[in-house]
Amino acid sequence: MQLGAFSVSLSVKDLAASRAFYEALGFSVTGGDPAQNWLVLRSNGTVIGLFQGMFEGNLLTFNPGWDQYRQELGQFQDVRELQDALDAQGIALTTRTDPDGQGTGYLQLADPDGNVILIDQHVERPKAR
């Protein structure tokens, strides 16, 4: 499976305090909107998202269609293909994407220890190969 770019999405209580903490560790803001309570920070190839009041717990996040620097890939495994592959393996999904969609989409699942995994596609389905 080609899951795409990886990041850790952290649920934070105080966006400004978390931003200052991660900047002290060498991360820089590369995206997001503080007015909407979220930021994306990067340190070399490591990406974290800070989200205040958007979800409970932390998420492992994959973005099909992007490389680690948010550059759109020409060919990639679409979120709907990933959903079909996970279904075929008998892996339970907690949130499903529209199987007939063409654009963006997301799905969620949890590993055996309850860690939530978000597969969140922000780009259009790739053209047929």
Language model features with spans:
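N-terminal beta-strand motif that seeds the catalytic metal site of vicinal oxygen chelate
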Residues: M1-A20, H122-R129
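Loop/turn position at the start of each blade in beta-propeller repeats
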Residues: L3, Q36, Q102-T104
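Structural preference for long, well-ordered alpha-helical segments within the folded cores
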Residues: A20-A24, D113
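Conserved acetyl-CoA-binding loop of GNAT-fold acetyltransferases
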Residues: E23-T30, I91
